[in-house]
């Protein structure tokens, strides 16, 4: 017999992502529509262990769908990674009458949800990360906003780069995944794209590319560099010393995490939030919501974490073909 869900907890964990508030809003309002109570858990698993738990009503999520960040705040928590911390978290959930938890975050957050599910707390994960690095889904909450933020910033850098006939290296987020760099590289017409998945790049080829473009009369050279490659400032110095072309590095940093979410992030996050509530109400647990082949889906967290994701080779190749 499926476990009856009366009270649903919701938390955000790991790095924040635009659209998390839209997901929280959907969780609260869908749960209320189904006659359930909702408790917001502040600061992720750290807040759960500190019992930073508040009742949430429909009014508490008014006027947040357009806001970046997360009203529940987020934090990383080493204590929760221990068996003792996980057991304590499960006991706190039971103490506060929380029957199920919706966890918005990345792979690490899902591993936490997996542990809670094993301890009798029904859990559903929502993919919330700007990196688009969760294998079970083609969409993650926040990626669309982050990549548009980066694209607009790179457009502005290109303007001044062209005026001064510079080479510009723009470093975007993505330690282990180069999706922001790849998408921006294509969208911004970058001459070179550096991805952590393609770490064996040849700097001499970049130098040759810059020199060839100068001979063709090109007035700028844009290099989009994922933070997993990094070292943009030192790379800029080497390129300038070798080519004689003025080269500047710009690190976009945490601005990519902020800002009002795009329409896509608001709609998809809202849909995922509502679906997570529906899954809990159906008695499901240890599931993660995703988006594949034009539809919203859910997978077993164990299976989702075992999936592998790689940069689309065709997209990478066309990015090189288009970067003349």
Task: Name the predicted role of every residue range.
Residues 103-105, 115, 122, 143-246:
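Accessory alpha-helical/coil subdomains and C-terminal extensions
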Residues 2, 48-101, 108-109, 141-148, ...:
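Glycine-rich oxoanion-binding loops at beta->alpha junctions
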Residues 36-42, 160-167, 219-223, 246-252, ...:
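Flexible, glycine/charged-enriched surface loops at secondary-structure junctions
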Residues 243, 287-324:
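Phosphate-binding loop/pocket of nucleotide- and phosphate-handling active sites
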Residues 39-41, 117-142, 194-198, 251:
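Short, acidic/small-residue loops that bind anionic groups at enzyme active sites
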Residues 22-27, 108-121, 181:
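Short Gly/Thr/Asp-enriched flexible loops that form oxyanion-binding sites at enzyme active sites
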Residues 2-49:
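N-terminal phosphate-binding or glycine-rich loops at protein starts, especially the Walker A/P-loop
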């Amino acid at each position: 017999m499926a476990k009856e869900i009366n009270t649903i907890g919701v938390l955000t964990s790991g790095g924040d992502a635009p659209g998390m508030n839209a997901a929280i809003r959907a969780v609260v309002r869908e749960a209320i529509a189904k006659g359930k109570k909702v408790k917001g858990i502040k600061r992720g698993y750290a807040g759960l262990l500190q019992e930073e738990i508040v009742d949430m009503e429909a009014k508490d999520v008014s006027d947040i769908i357009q806001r970046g960040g997360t009203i529940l705040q987020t934090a990383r928590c080493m204590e929760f990674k221990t068996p003792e911390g996980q057991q304590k978290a499960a006991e706190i959930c039971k103490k506060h009458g929380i029957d199920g938890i919706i966890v918005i975050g990345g792979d690490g957050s899902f591993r936490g949800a997996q542990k809670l599910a094993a301890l009798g707390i029904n859990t559903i994960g929502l993919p919330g990360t700007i990196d688009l690095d969760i294998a079970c889904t083609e969409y993650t909450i926040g990626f669309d906003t982050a990549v548009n933020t980066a694209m607009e910033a790179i457009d502005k850098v290109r303007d001044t780069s062209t005026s001064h006939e510079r080479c510009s290296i723009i470093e975007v987020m993505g330690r282990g995944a180069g999706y922001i760099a790849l998408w921006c590289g294509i969208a911004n017409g970058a001459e070179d794209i550096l991805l952590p998945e393609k770490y064996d790049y040849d700097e001499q080829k970049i130098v040759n590319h810059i020199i060839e473009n100068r001979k063709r009369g090109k007035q700028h050279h844009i290099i989009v560099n994922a933070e997993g490659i990094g070292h943009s400032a030192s790379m800029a110095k080497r390129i300038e010393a070798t080519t004689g072309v003025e080269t500047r590095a710009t690190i976009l940093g945490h601005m990519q995490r902020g800002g009002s979410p795009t329409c896509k992030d608001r709609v998809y996050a809202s849909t995922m939030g509502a679906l997570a509530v529906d899954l809990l109400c159906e008695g499901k647990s240890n599931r993660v919501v995703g988006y594949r082949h034009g539809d919203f889906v859910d997978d077993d967290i164990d299976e989702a974490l075992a999936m592998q994701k790689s940069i689309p080779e065709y997209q990478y190749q066309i990015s090189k073909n288009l970067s003349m």
